[in-house]
Amino acid sequence: MSVQGFWGLQLVPGKTYSQVVSAPFRITMASLAADAEAGKRTSVSVLVDEKEFVLCTLVPNKIEQQPLDITFVEGEEVTFSAKGQNNIHLTGNYVFQDDEDDEMGASMIDSDEEDNVEDFLKKLPPNASKEDINKALLGLEVDEEIESDEEVESDEEIESDEEIESEEEEEEPVPVSKKRPAEEVKEIASKKQKAEKKEQPKKEKSKKEEPKKEEPKKEQPKKEEPKKKEEPKKKEEPKKKEEPKKKEEPKKKEEPKKKEEPKKKEEPKKKITKLPNGLIIEDIKMGEGASCKNGQRVGMRYIGKLTNGKVFDKNVSGKPFSFLLGRGEVIKGWDLGIAGMKAGGERKLTIPAPLAYGKRGAPPDIPKNATLVFDVKLLSMK
């Protein structure tokens, strides 16, 4: 069962409308605008993966509406356009899975995963280090998945596909649940205290860097003032009346420049997007290059917190956390919130419980119905 919300777009001939899909939606109807000119033929096209396709062609008084059934998923780059003389209205709906279906599937996966993790830990040598355990849990299945993908060209294609699907189901509760074997619960608590101590000097450094940018700006007018005072000493008395005019002009010009520059820099940092499913995406830094898509392997740094500020998980050094985007290897809030990021980009994701760990939570660190806050940074994508 799915939850549906209205989606709509008005196409104007000569203009294109591009986006990276952040929430799946379905187009169900294309219609001519009410003020369409008679006899003017208009076509609707969509560009996907650098290939253009015509969805329909509408003609006033002949074909004014055309039912459609086209769905676009998260991470796809799509561009809509209209060619002709008339405006076109595209309508449809967003599509999200119901919470109850997600929780039933998640509970079955969680129980199976816990059994598999316990069996796997029993097979490890008693002197295995924490780093060996993490690599075994996070890296082993990923390496096997890549190798199986490269070999799927023979008669065993069906069998290898089934193995990949089972591995993805076991990895679904990443990034938190995979790092919680029973032997590491005590170590996580000590890491949380270190994370809180590390965050304080980082905040102090950012505060110190801000006034450093303002100091050279204030020193500029100070250098100009003594020069202006020396000039009237050499000049005659009637020219002293012109001094206040010369002082006022540069001050008026410099003040708006100082105010405009920080405003332009702050605008992209505070870009906030709220999706109909409750996910809030705040772009802190945009990054450079192409946007990441579904199916790409991305490397991430992150800090996971509860709404009260308590840190429950993080990856801030060492090997970045990597996963296949849009393949269900992480919580839904990550698949939706990271899509469209660029290398070096930073975001703050506020993820509601239905897109995280739902009513069950992930004891003991994540309570039931918990809203999670992640500070994420995209390091790489392949």
From Swiss-Prot:
Residues 141-173 have a biased composition (Acidic residues). Its main location: nucleus. Gene3D superfamilies: 3.10.50.40, Nucleoplasmin core domain (2.60.120.340). It catalyses: [protein]-peptidylproline (omega=180) = [protein]-peptidylproline (omega=0). Residues 295-382 form the PPIase FKBP-type domain. Its EC number is 5.2.1.8. One of its GO terms (molecular function) is peptidyl-prolyl cis-trans isomerase activity. Keywords: Chaperone, Isomerase, Nucleus, Rotamase. One of its GO terms (cellular component) is chromatin. Residues 180-190, 196-270 have a biased composition (Basic and acidic residues). PPIase that acts as a histone chaperone. Histone proline isomerase that increases the rate of cis-trans isomerization at prolines on the histone H3 N-terminal tail. Proline isomerization influences H3 methylation thereby regulating gene expression. This is FK506-binding protein 4.
